[in-house]
């Protein structure tokens, strides 16, 4: 079996087909930064709790943190190769692990994952997580999260 390698395909992947104006870039970065700050806090908390023989959760939190750092680099333009976005698992973690136990963290990961999906799909226009057409209940959900988690909401 012969696999043909096309440098054009690689070049297309290295230059995303989406465009992001400066305002959208800043908003996307704000979503990712909020998720990253909370991920770093959760990672530190879990690492402090887990003993040396009990390291089951730390890798998951580290993975989420690394994916968010990579996404930030893609949004800022520091990272041109968007191929790794195809391998992101943080959205799955948000649903399976955090939706019930840590809704604020799940929300932050969902927002960052949504932005990553927009980039991965090479959308010509990036829709933000608070887009009223895509998520009409966004602001009500945010008000509920802020009421439940006032000390971490603006982290």
Region locations from a protein language model:
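Short terminal alpha-helical segments
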Residues: 2-59, 142-144, 149-152
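Amphipathic alpha-helical interaction modules
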Residues: 41-97
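Hydrophobic transmembrane signal anchors and adjacent membrane-proximal interface regions, especially
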Residues: 1-8, 69, 126-128
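Amphipathic alpha-helical binding modules
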Residues: 87-155
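Non-membrane alpha-helical secondary structure
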Residues: 20, 24-27, 31, 56, ...
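Detector for Asparagine
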Residues: 9, 31-34, 66, 130, ...
């Amino acid at each position: 079996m012969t696999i043909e390698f096309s440098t054009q395909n690689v070049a297309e992947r290295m230059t995303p087909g989406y465009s992001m104006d400066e305002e959208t870039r800043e908003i996307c970065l704000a979503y990712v930064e909020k998720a990253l700050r909370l991920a770093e806090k959760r990672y530190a908390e879990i690492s402090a709790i887990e003993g040396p023989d009990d390291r089951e959760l730390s890798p998951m939190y580290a993975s989420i943190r690394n994916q968010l750092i990579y996404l930030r680099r893609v949004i800022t333009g520091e990272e041109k190769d968007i191929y790794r976005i195809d391998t992101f698992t943080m959205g799955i973690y948000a649903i399976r692990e955090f939706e019930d136990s840590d809704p604020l963290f799940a929300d932050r990961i969902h927002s960052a994952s949504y932005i990553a999906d927009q980039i991965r799909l090479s959308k010509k226009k990036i829709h933000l997580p608070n887009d009223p057409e895509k998520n009409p209940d966004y602001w009500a959900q945010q008000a509920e999260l802020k009421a439940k988690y006032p000390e971490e909401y603006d982290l």
